[in-house]
Amino acid sequence: MEIIKISPRGYCYGVIDAMVIAKNASLDPNLPRPIHILGMIVHNKHVTDAFESIGIYTVDGANREEILDKITTGTVIFTAHGVSPSVKAKAVAKGLTTIDATCPDVLHTYNLILEKQAAGYEIIYIGKKGHPEPEGAYGTAPDVVHLVETKADIDALSLLSDKIFVTNQTTMSKWDVADLMHYIKGKFPKAIQHQEICMATQVRQEAVALQAKDADLTIVVGDPRSNNTARLAQVSIEKAGTKAYRIADITELDIEWIKDAKKVAVTAGASTPTQLVREVLLFLEQFDAADKTTWKREHNQDFERILPKTKNKYMAEKRSQRLAHLKNGGS
């Protein structure tokens, strides 16, 4: 069996930043305890379990406001997906110490929404309903942000203003966003469009579209709640023409998928620990369809290998530089 190791894959800088911020919090004796994360720091249960092992507790729920109601004391970390100003204000009003791990790319989109609101625009935001990033985007300017996920949502819009700005969730499929933006342009010809697929998401999607073409199947390693992981599987099917299977870790890999395969492509979501991908690759490298002794799939739970090992003293400066770069038109 030939294994196509799609590159790039796995952790993006936003995920790494958020994890380092949370790890640093665990090492700071001056922060009020307990330390909670408002939702999953990134959408991967292996990561949240690893943080719980060092005293950083995930509190989850339907939305950020609801989750915050469950936290009464200590420190709260806002996840990489971002939160609305009202959630931040509520946390402060409750007397909680707050730490913001929002990805700079997401912050840039939120800032853009505020700028366009101040300039008198109605904002159409393309995103996945129920995902925390669009929740935060809508909450940034609820009077002018209109969340759409499908063409039916766009059909239902009734906007009288000619000043319309269109942007999107950073982890969407770039092809889906382009399709919906084209549809929006047909209904609102004067709309200004600004695609905000983050570069890490885009290059991972493009890699799958190109590198999975010759594979018999693609294995996408990532949490079932990860939107960017779902989009990678979608890209494999729709753009590379290769069937795809999503697994959280090696224990979910079905032998039936691979026993007759000649080429297997492997990629991973931006919130997937490298250790989990390595286990899949090592298994495939030794797999022999004719030898059942090679079929055993085991996950070695090693939290130390999932969590970042060192503090990054330049973290705040690096994040500020990234935000400035995006504001100046960078990608």
Curated annotation (Swiss-Prot):
Tell me the residue numbers annotated for binding [4Fe-4S] cluster: 12, 103, 198
Quick one: signal sequence residues? none
Q: Where is the active site?
A: 133 (proton donor)
Q: Where does (2E)-4-hydroxy-3-methylbut-2-enyl diphosphate bind?
A: 43, 81, 131, 170, 226, 228, 271
What is written in the cofactor note of this entry? Binds 1 [4Fe-4S] cluster per subunit.
Q: GO cellular component annotations, sorted alphabetically?
A: cytosol
Q: What is its EC number?
A: 1.17.7.4
Q: Which reaction equations make up its catalytic activity?
A: isopentenyl diphosphate + 2 oxidized [2Fe-2S]-[ferredoxin] + H2O = (2E)-4-hydroxy-3-methylbut-2-enyl diphosphate + 2 reduced [2Fe-2S]-[ferredoxin] + 2 H(+); dimethylallyl diphosphate + 2 oxidized [2Fe-2S]-[ferredoxin] + H2O = (2E)-4-hydroxy-3-methylbut-2-enyl diphosphate + 2 reduced [2Fe-2S]-[ferredoxin] + 2 H(+)
Where along the chain is isopentenyl diphosphate bound? 43, 81, 131, 226, 228, 271
In terms of Pfam families, this protein maps to: LYTB
Q: Which cofactor does it need?
A: [4Fe-4S] cluster
Query: Which InterPro entries does the record cross-reference, listed alphabetically?
Result: LytB/IspH (IPR003451)
Q: Which UniProt keywords apply?
A: 4Fe-4S, Iron, Iron-sulfur, Isoprene biosynthesis, Metal-binding, Oxidoreductase
Enzyme group, top EC level?
A: oxidoreductase
UniProt-listed CDD domains: lytB_ispH
The molecular function terms of the Gene Ontology recorded here are: 4 iron, 4 sulfur cluster binding; 4-hydroxy-3-methylbut-2-enyl diphosphate reductase activity; metal ion binding
Q: Which residues bind dimethylallyl diphosphate?
A: 43, 81, 131, 226, 228, 271
Please give the pathway this protein is involved in: Isoprenoid biosynthesis; dimethylallyl diphosphate biosynthesis; dimethylallyl diphosphate from (2E)-4-hydroxy-3-methylbutenyl diphosphate: step 1/1; Isoprenoid biosynthesis; isopentenyl diphosphate biosynthesis via DXP pathway; isopentenyl diphosphate from 1-deoxy-D-xylulose 5-phosphate: step 6/6
Q: In Gene Ontology terms, what is a biological process of this protein?
A: dimethylallyl diphosphate biosynthetic process
Q: Which NCBIfam families match?
A: ispH_lytB, PRK01045.1-1
Q: What does this protein do?
A: Catalyzes the conversion of 1-hydroxy-2-methyl-2-(E)-butenyl 4-diphosphate (HMBPP) into a mixture of isopentenyl diphosphate (IPP) and dimethylallyl diphosphate (DMAPP). Acts in the terminal step of the DOXP/MEP pathway for isoprenoid precursor biosynthesis.
HAMAP family xrefs: IspH
Recorded family membership: Belongs to the IspH family.
What name does the UniProt record give this protein?
A: 4-hydroxy-3-methylbut-2-enyl diphosphate reductase
Gene name of the encoded protein: ispH
